[in-house]
Amino acid sequence: MKFVVSSNTLLTRLQAVSKVIGGKPVQPILDNILLVATEGVLYATASDKETTMEARIELESLEEEGKITIPAKILLDILKEFPEQPLTFEINTETNEVKIISEKGEFSVPGESAEDYPIQAALNDSSNDLTSKCGLILEGIVKTIFATANDDLRPVMNCILIEMNEDNFTFVASDAHKLVRYKRFDAKSENGQFSLILPKKPALMLKNILPKE
């Protein structure tokens, strides 16, 4: 596995997805970020088994496809040391050793097999896609997330309900003491009426990474 990628682009994407990783992962390998290089693109995935985030990074070049997992903290600490420049990643798939080659030298990082990384089950055919302006989703989260609860016994109260129809989007949150409903009439669903429940953790992550426009 061998590819070349922009150091700043990779760092920015990995900083975003790494926010998913919890302090005490249920499996040690979930401290790692899964990297999959294929067809000129690098996919970076982080998960805590409940929430999974994937970033897509265009590669400057891809010599050999493959996949590997690398400890998130080690990788991020290394990337923070580089000014913007192309970095070459060379991975020995037999030993899982990762070499990161820069303009001034190289680092060697121990990786782990991607085969051991738990992959989230694919969505079934009855699932709906939601495509919307980032600013709209961000505004809906900002206007309602403060009303969500922190209740382990009633986890649904820790979420935001998003309802979509042909007329508007509605965001609803409640902790059983207060109820907040926020409607946007400048958005609509083109797939009929449906709804989704967005847990607080991914909602907070989206709040922190989505651009306002």
Task: Describe every region a protein language model picked out.
Residues M1-E213:
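Structural preference for solvent-exposed beta-strand-turn elements
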